[in-house]
Amino acid sequence: EGIYRHYRTLAESTDTPIILYNVPGRTGVNIKSETTLRLATDCPNIIGIKEASGNVDQVRAIMLEKPDPFIVLSGDDHLSLSFIKEGAEGVISVIGNAYPELFSRLIHLCLENRFEEAEIIQQRLEGMYYLMFVDGNPAGIKELLYQKGLIRHNILRLPLVSASDSTSTLIARVRNQIEQR
């Protein structure tokens, strides 16, 4: 009930569209599908959710009862294909920052119900999904972007720290595999 009241209070204080972000791995609390659906129904400016619970059943439950035009987006790159199969409309991505064309292609193939083709790209990126979070977010993606020359440094502000040497080495190895294809 506390989560519902919190978001309802936010929604009532502004006309700005709001996208919920369900990331229990960071917050320690899951926004249950029932709460999401209540907010979607009761608060017209809550327009969607970035669903990063890792729970396909929860996404399915939201998709079955959500009002139109409430948007469901994956917040887990590695589950985007599965979430889109359940009806999610897209993703707010981490890996897409480093491989925008490739990841966009994967998502567009999913949205076109071309899942076999999407699965080929999914398998190509699979090893990197995991490495993005080994040393915590955003250490992995910052290291990958640095290695690709897309940012000038991979330094994070404390208490966050950069990717470890072993993770950096693995990112370089998997990056080489991805980019050779």
Describe each region flagged by the PLM.
Residues 12-13, 26-133:
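Catalytic alpha/beta core domains of metabolic enzymes, predominantly
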Residues 1-28, 38:
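Active-site beta->alpha loop and helix N-cap motifs at the rims of alpha/beta catalytic domains
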Residues 2-7, 32-36, 81, 141:
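Short, acidic/polar
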Residues 95, 99-181:
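C-terminal alpha-helical cap/extension of soluble enzyme domains
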Residues 22-23, 45-46, 157:
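Glycine-rich phosphate-binding "P-loop"
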